[in-house]
């Protein structure tokens, strides 16, 4: 089954003729370089958690070539995250495309921000043994408040029943389906956040030192320390450029969320609300 994704779910620049020509050239060159092993970097997380910001921070680095939600990569990744049965159809194309993009990026290292790869990370790690993974986590209240403001992210909670259940991407299971249907949008966004939090926990056990967890609030408040930690993890010779800090985003949720919404979020995530 092919699911119908909403139009323009990707913020990346659409594919152009120049992209197709560039990749065709790489495909021809790689035919004579069968031993080439890419070492891509993948940014993982849920929507509105800071994955975009992390990619923007790394994008100017001279050693990296950064893709941010680039079609058709982002579309493939999102569809597989929502519907695992799509993996047989789409995964081979995704892996080939990553190999071509990584080869085309040389001598720079490919970094891709298609954050739903959080649900595909084990397969990516298996195929690309030198890959590294950046898992991004933001507090539940900031994530939910930002999700409610963002039409494209809010869409998923509003239209969840248009997609297969179970739905790991949204955190909907057969067991919680009926309860989810009765939830507010804030609570549904909290369900999604919790599913991604637990998935990050799972991936840390699976990927070990191939993954680093970046916390949104620490990147805001302990920027130098966190950039150095990320630089060390990625084995970058040059420092990561200093980003613009918008510290008001840490507390904005207190203005955006009502007391009822905060209570609904707490009811969903329980003690996990303290984790960020």
Mark where each language-model region is.
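Conserved phosphate-donor/acceptor-positioning beta-strand/loop module used by diverse small-molecule
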Residues: 127-148
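Anion-recognition interface
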Residues: 81, 87-97, 107-124, 151-191, ...
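PAPS-dependent sulfotransferase catalytic core
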Residues: 1-105, 152-153
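Short, conserved active-site loop motifs that form the nucleotide-linked donor/cofactor pocket
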Residues: 64, 131, 210-211
């Amino acid at each position: 089954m092919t699911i119908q994704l909403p139009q323009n779910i990707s913020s990346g620049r659409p594919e152009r003729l120049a992209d197709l020509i560039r990749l065709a050239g790489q495909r021809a060159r790689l035919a004579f370089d069968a031993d080439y092993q890419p070492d891509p970097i993948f940014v993982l997380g849920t929507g509105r958690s800071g994955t975009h910001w992390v990619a923007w921070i790394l994008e100017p680095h001279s050693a990296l070539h950064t893709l941010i939600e680039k079609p058709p990569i982002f579309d493939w990744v999102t569809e597989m995250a929502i519907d695992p049965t799509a993996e047989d159809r789409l995964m081979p194309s995704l892996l080939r495309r990553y190999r071509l993009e990584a080869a085309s990026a040389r001598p720079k290292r490919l970094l891709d921000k298609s954050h739903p790869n959080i649900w595909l990370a084990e397969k990516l790690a298996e195929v690309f043994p030198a890959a590294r993974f950046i898992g991004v986590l933001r507090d539940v209240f900031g994530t939910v408040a930002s999700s409610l403001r963002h039409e494209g992210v809010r869409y998923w909670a509003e239209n969840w029943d248009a997609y297969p259940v179970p739905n790991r991407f949204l955190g909907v299971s057969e067991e919680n389906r009926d309860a989810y249907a009765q939830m507010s949008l804030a609570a549904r966004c909290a369900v999604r956040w919790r599913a991604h939090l637990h998935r990050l926990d799972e991936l840390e056990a699976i990927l070990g030192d191939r993954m680093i967890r970046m916390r949104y609030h620490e990147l805001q408040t302990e920027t130098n320390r966190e950039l150095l930690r990320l630089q060390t993890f990625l084995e970058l010779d040059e420092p990561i450029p200093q980003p613009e800090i918008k510290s008001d985003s840490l507390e904005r949720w207190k203005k955006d969320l009502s007391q009822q919404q905060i209570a609904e979020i707490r009811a969903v995530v329980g003690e996990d609300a303290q984790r960020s």
